[in-house]
Amino acid sequence: MSAKKPMALVILDGYGHRETQADNAITNANTPVLDGLMANQPNTLISASGMDVGLPDGQMGNSEVGHTNIGAGRVVYQDLTRITKAISDGEFQQNETLVNAIDKAVKAGKAVHIMGLMSPGGVHSHEDHIYAAVEMAAARGAEKIYLHCFLDGRDTPPRSAENSLKNFQELFAKLGKGRIASLVGRYYAMDRDNNWERVQKAYDLMTEAKAEFTFATAVEGLEAAYAREENDEFVQATEIKAEGEESAAIVDGDAVIFMNYRADRARQITRTFVPSFDGFTRNVFPAIDFVMLTQYAADIPLLCAFAPASLENTYGEWLSKEGKTQLRISETEKYAHVTFFFNGGIEDEFEGEERQLVASPKVATYDLQPEMSAPELTEKLVAAIKSGKYDAIVCNFPNCDMVGHTGVYDAAVKAVESLDECIGKVVEAIKEVDGQLLITADHGNAEMMIDPETGGVHTAHTNLPVPLIYVGSKAVEFKEGGKLSDLAPTMLALTDTAIPAEMSGEVLFK
């Protein structure tokens, strides 16, 4: 069998690009190898943060998200950004599960109930999503739109719900239909420790309008709770109903949409709407269409608007299906990233996949040994390149990230310099076997060691772009505007391997 010419991906963890030289451990390090590559090899900058990696706009990237996106060959959206994006591009408003539930209730002259954590917190839900659901129900002809508000005060300040409630009151006034039907603190509605007596108060409130208190408006109900010394999280079951208004309890034929996207605190209240539930005795059990925004648990037999995104045909799985061999190699600190996260959350190796782990040094903090285990890792990586055994190799050098996190500038510079030496050996090996190499990063860190705003030590990741360098015999010219999820399709194209349909990332050369 002839020796394989590997396609290698080397991820320099935490190696971001920043124009400013001040406090930049990367540009201030002595790096003849990387400087030479940047001067003489095809290279570009790619995005590793925010919506480009499925995070909220402007949010810095991290290693888990970065490696997941690289391996998937598509942007992997977190639930918050997935729903936000679906709303902005109209996919939410056309979602078949939501459309069917709303339309069925409208046709029967029934109500559409929307429940969820009314908060801009963004941890379990986002009120912008709930706003969109109300507008969607109204646009599809629902006359009775009832909003059941779970109040936050944990992921938001303890008494901050008034603004949210006013916004929804204004929305209903503008629509000329619908109203806030109930208030209850998340302590009751979103318990996750089997305190069913709490959950029952929220269930009875929504299904029977059974409440400790009734007020004409939501803001009045909230003010009364504050007067009772109850912060948002602990607001007792409160019915909102002005004189002459009909009850907004959930009844047969209604549609109920639960707008929380995070599962752990949504499961219990959702299970109370399942026929087989026995956590407490329900006085009423309405026959309804109940829609979970995301799948709270695989064993909850209710409708789900946004099923879990499948990460089928990641780079590793696809290479395996194509009968190719691959190696994943890193030291302890980033081993999980080049294996579990790179494989889309799959623990086991694919057929043809091998793994090598180099132990990270046993030091209190990595500024004490900025080169970490890079020399040994490089030795093993070079041997793997020359072995002729592997079609593809993925390697992570953790130094810039792990030493960057210590905040010790001089150590970060040393980390970069030790990497430069290592990269020189890797490039030499690749050229020797006529292989191909992409050098990049999963996010930035070491390029900003002092916070420009506070003047204090900067130990966090950045939201800056990362370099992408090609070494190999192909005449490659990069396109601008790439992101981490473009790397897998690019590597497949470089090796003349078919690209699976699931990979929506782009090939990064012209």
From Swiss-Prot:
UniProt cross-references to InterPro entries, sorted A to Z: Alkaline_phosphatase_core_sf, BPG-indep_PGM_N, Metalloenzyme, PGAM_B_sf, Pgm_bpd_ind
UniProt cross-references to Gene3D superfamilies, sorted A to Z: Alkaline Phosphatase, subunit A (3.40.720.10), BPG-independent phosphoglycerate mutase, domain B (3.40.1450.10)
SUPFAM superfamilies: 2,3-Bisphosphoglycerate-independent phosphoglycerate mutase, substrate-binding domain, Alkaline phosphatase-like
Gene Ontology biological process terms, A to Z: glucose catabolic process; glycolytic process
Pathway listed: Carbohydrate degradation; glycolysis; pyruvate from D-glyceraldehyde 3-phosphate: step 3/5
Residues involved in Mn(2+) 1 binding: D401, H405, H461
Cofactor note: Binds 2 manganese ions per subunit.
Residues annotated as binding Mn(2+) 2: D13, S63, D442, H443
Enzyme category, top tier: isomerase
Active-site residues annotated for this sequence: S63
UniProt GO cellular component terms: cytosol
GO molecular function, one term: phosphoglycerate mutase activity
Residues that, per the record, bind substrate: H124, R154, D155, R186, R192, R262, A263, D264, R265, K334
Pfam families (UniProt xref): iPGM_N, Metalloenzyme
Reactions mediated catalytically: (2R)-2-phosphoglycerate = (2R)-3-phosphoglycerate
EC numbers, comma separated: 5.4.2.12
Task of the protein: Catalyzes the interconversion of 2-phosphoglycerate and 3-phosphoglycerate.
Family label: Belongs to the BPG-independent phosphoglycerate mutase family.
Family matches, as NCBIfam families: pgm_bpd_ind, PRK05434.1-5
Subunit structure: Monomer.
PANTHER family: 2,3-BISPHOSPHOGLYCERATE-INDEPENDENT PHOSPHOGLYCERATE MUTASE
Annotated protein name in UniProt: 2,3-bisphosphoglycerate-independent phosphoglycerate mutase
